[in-house]
């Protein structure tokens, strides 16, 4: 009887270890893992092979006292891989966020994946995070703050973000180098075909990060800002064009501003929020940026 019990216990431990090991299929550090206090890694998860997960490397630090808010990310050109944004996404994750980007992990070399993705992959990311938080066999069990979720994206990924922004689980929206076309159908065939009416479905504080007048999405994004009057909205412009600063070390200025927004909206960090609050807002001290805001302190 005792031997049988030992065998059952041993099998249980083996299966638990096997499950934990199977969750992370591949892992790679981007740059130095970010400047935040949690060194980040880029991973492929066995239970979500359709996405790339940027996460603090050591998640044992998260649980009862501090949990991981969720950021679902849509890529530029609606690519099915976040290869254009890895520096930016790794940097954000290093500040204690679970960033789930649409698409497969970028290759270390060679031609990157340029297949197209769909907006539903953002909600797939949210579904996965919630499921992982309640799965006792998951490394993320009870470590995720499922009540603090952002949807975000760049260019075509920004349109994907706006398409799913009505999801009641969403806590904040971040739209980068994007905006809804004034004339429906003016985008490429693979882009979400939205109208300005979609903006009325936003129900959370919203941040737009644009690349100034040289950004091909500038007019659309600024028009979105003008038409959003029912929620807090902040639009910031840096004169860098449509490409932003995502590929710069640690994601450059766009990562700094976006991370501050995420910290404020998803972690309740009032110090980070000072970048956006006040008259003038703290961002006014940074000569790289101009901004407008409404329905905000």
Stretch-by-stretch model annotation:
Residues 82-102:
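Short amphipathic alpha-helix adjacent to the substrate-entry channel of hydrolases
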Residues 65-76:
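Short beta-strand element of the alpha/beta-hydrolase
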Residues 60-67, 111-159:
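Gly/Ser-rich "nucleophile elbow"/oxyanion-hole loop immediately N-terminal to the catalytic nucleophile
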Residues 240-243, 248-297:
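Alpha/beta-hydrolase-fold serine-hydrolase catalytic core, especially in secreted/extracellular enzymes
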Residues 8-18:
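Bacterial N-terminal signal peptides
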Residues 171-248:
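The feature captures the conserved acid-bearing segment of alpha/beta-hydrolase catalytic domains
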């Amino acid at each position: 009887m005792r031997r049988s019990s030992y065998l059952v216990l041993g099998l249980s431990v083996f299966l638990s270890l096997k499950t934990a090991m199977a969750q992370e299929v591949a892992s790679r550090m981007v740059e130095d893992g970010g400047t935040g206090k949690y060194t980040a890694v880029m991973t492929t998860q066995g239970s979500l092979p359709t996405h790339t997960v940027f996460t603090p490397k050591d998640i044992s630090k998260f649980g009862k006292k501090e949990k991981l808010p969720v950021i679902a990310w849509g890529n530029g050109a609606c690519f099915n891989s976040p290869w254009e944004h890895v520096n930016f996404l790794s940097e954000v994750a290093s500040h204690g966020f679970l960033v789930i980007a649409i698409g497969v992990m970028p290759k270390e070399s060679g031609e990157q994946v340029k297949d197209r993705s769909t907006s539903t992959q953002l909600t797939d990311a949210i579904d996965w995070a919630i499921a992982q938080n309640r799965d006792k066999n998951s490394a993320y069990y009870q470590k995720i703050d499922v009540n603090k979720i952002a949807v975000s994206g760049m260019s075509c990924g920004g349109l994907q973000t706006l398409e799913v922004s009505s999801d009641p689980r969403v806590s904040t929206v971040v739209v980068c180098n994007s905006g809804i076309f004034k004339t429906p159908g003016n985008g490429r065939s693979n882009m979400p075909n939205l109208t300005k009416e979609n903006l009325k479905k936003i129900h959370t504080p919203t941040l737009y990060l644009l690349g100034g007048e040289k950004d091909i999405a500038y007019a659309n994004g600024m028009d979105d800002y003008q038409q959003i009057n029912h929620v807090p909205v902040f639009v910031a412009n840096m004169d860098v064009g449509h490409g932003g600063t995502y590929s710069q070390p640690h994601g450059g200025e766009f990562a700094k501003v976006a991370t501050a927004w995420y910290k404020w909206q998803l972690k309740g960090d009032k110090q980070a929020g000072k970048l956006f609050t006040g008259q003038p807002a703290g961002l006014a001290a940074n000569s790289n940026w101009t901004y407008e805001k409404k329905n905000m302190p």
